[in-house]
């Protein structure tokens, strides 16, 4: 992972895909446009459908980062070392950042389509509870001074946190009625709200946001590692 994060090619490709998706996606009209390209002009959604290029890819990026954090926590319990712990917490911290951005863009979208920034919806409530679980993970890490004890305790909690988060945002909402697409019988990514033109920009946007989240994570992980090295050098 460390060798991959230091490589530059995937960062250029990711930023290129992201710029293509966002700039072009914001330019494509909701009616017959240049070269026949247009986004679905649906009732209620209207122009807010462009938020699909932000809200959903941010959540995909969050889940991807939290999955990596989960994997590194398992790896740390098997072979404890500082770098594995740094990867676990670094991916989790940036994952929480993208989760917060996902919630913010979702609230803006909800206000436009549902008439309120927040509703008593199992998907939304599950996302909020999941974020609180990860905030508790970060607080737990800062409350333990011994490095080895902190690493093992945090890794164990992180494994629990990821499993619970997946249950809160993917499993439980599917078992109940929900306004959110993809839950409670409300389909997501159907031909009704995701046509071929929108797919041309949605998939590159998803890959671009994931690449950006990985790039930010690599910088943050490196910063944390250098900070630890500097503090030990001063001591």
Question: Residue spans of the language-model regions?
Answer:
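Polytopic transmembrane helical bundles with strong interfacial aromatic enrichment
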Residues: 1-235
């Amino acid at each position: 992972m460390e060798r991959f994060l230091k490589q530059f090619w995937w960062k250029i490709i990711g930023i290129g895909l992201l710029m293509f998706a966002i700039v072009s996606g914001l330019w494509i009209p909701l009616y017959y446009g240049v070269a026949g390209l247009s986004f679905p002009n649906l009732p209620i959604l209207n122009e807010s459908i462009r938020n699909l290029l932000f809200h959903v890819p941010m959540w995909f990026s969050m889940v991807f980062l939290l999955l990596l954090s989960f994997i590194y926590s398992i790896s740390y319990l098997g072979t404890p070392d500082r770098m594995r712990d740094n990867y676990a917490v670094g991916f989790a911290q940036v994952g929480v950042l993208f989760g917060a951005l996902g919630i913010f863009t979702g609230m803006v979208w909800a206000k436009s389509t549902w008439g309120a920034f927040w509703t008593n919806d199992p998907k939304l409530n599950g996302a909020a509870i999941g974020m609180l679980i990860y905030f508790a993970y970060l607080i737990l890490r800062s409350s333990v001074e011994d490095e080895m004890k902190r690493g093992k305790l945090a890794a164990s909690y992180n494994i629990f946190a990821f499993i619970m988060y997946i249950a809160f945002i993917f499993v439980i909402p599917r078992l109940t009625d929900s306004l959110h697409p993809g839950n409670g019988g409300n389909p997501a990514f159907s031909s009704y709200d995701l046509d071929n033109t929108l797919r041309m920009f949605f998939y590159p946007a998803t890959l671009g946001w994931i690449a950006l989240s990985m790039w930010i994570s690599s910088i943050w992980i490196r910063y944390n590692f250098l900070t630890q090295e500097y503090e030990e050098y001063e001591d």
